[in-house]
Curated annotation (Swiss-Prot):
A Gene Ontology cellular-component term: cytoplasm
Highest rank taxon of the organism: Bacteria
Pfam family, one: HSP33
Protein name as annotated: 33 kDa chaperonin
Residues annotated as signal peptide: none
Gene: hslO
Molecular-function GO term, any one: protein folding chaperone
InterPro entries found in the cross-reference section: Heat_shock_Hsp33 (IPR000397), Heat_shock_Hsp33_C (IPR016154), Heat_shock_Hsp33_N (IPR016153)
Amino acid sequence: MSDYLVKALAYDGMARVYAAVTTETIKEAQRRHDTWSVSSAALGRTMTGTLFLGAMQKEDQKITVKIEGDGPIGPIVADSNAQGQIRGYVTNPHVHFSELNEAGKLDVRRGVGTSGMLSVVKDLGFGENFTGQTPIVSGEIGEDFTYYLATSEQINSSVGVGVLVNPDDTIEAAGGFMLQLLPGATDEIIDEIEKNLTALPTVSRMIEAGETPESILAKLAGGEDKLQILEKIPVSFECNCSKERFGSAIISLGKEEIRSMIEEDHGAEAECHFCRNTYDFSEEELEKLYEEAK
């Protein structure tokens, strides 16, 4: 099944809800970055959370999320847009612990760390950016997105993200949900939401069992008839890197740096952090870039 995200209203229009299956997308990220179990889970959760923030944006806006904890994984970066395109990378892809956490799951908190920051940069178009930053509160990532939304954007939310990793490090299931309270929600509605959230199985297990974004939202809303589906968006791993972009980056290094690439290295190889694609520049190509540099 192809990955997709569903946006809907629930609880008499008092909550905005999102759910997504991201299994194929996270499989692609795992393959490109050769991530081990804990790194895969952390990257997949971050990418899925970022996907939800991207889905909240207007058409030409973009979101970049960076989670910098004090764990061995190092910084995790993901970006997404309103079209369901997502990419991401983790600084140390090879983190695996043989011991599971107290809940019998991969110990993502230990990998990410419990001290650090979650920062979000919104590219609003027209060269205008908005940056929000909150401390990491758990290192489990879903709770960290929840805290960011409540603190930085004043939106009471619940974010659940999960990745099920096979013993051979391949991805079995990935996805998540996000629920946001809208102004006017009554205490009764809040109580009902809390009851449904408590009864909800873990996201990765639901997806492994074949649940769809629609069926996850139905569980979240307390029934299919209580949902008003607004939009369905295809989700995929997409990177917009290109040789031209890397050429511009090389030009920005300045003439001296480019001259040293030509004379000492006799060429250059650039690698994209997000997708691991590489771009080779010959001496001749570097000479052309040298002419354009200041």
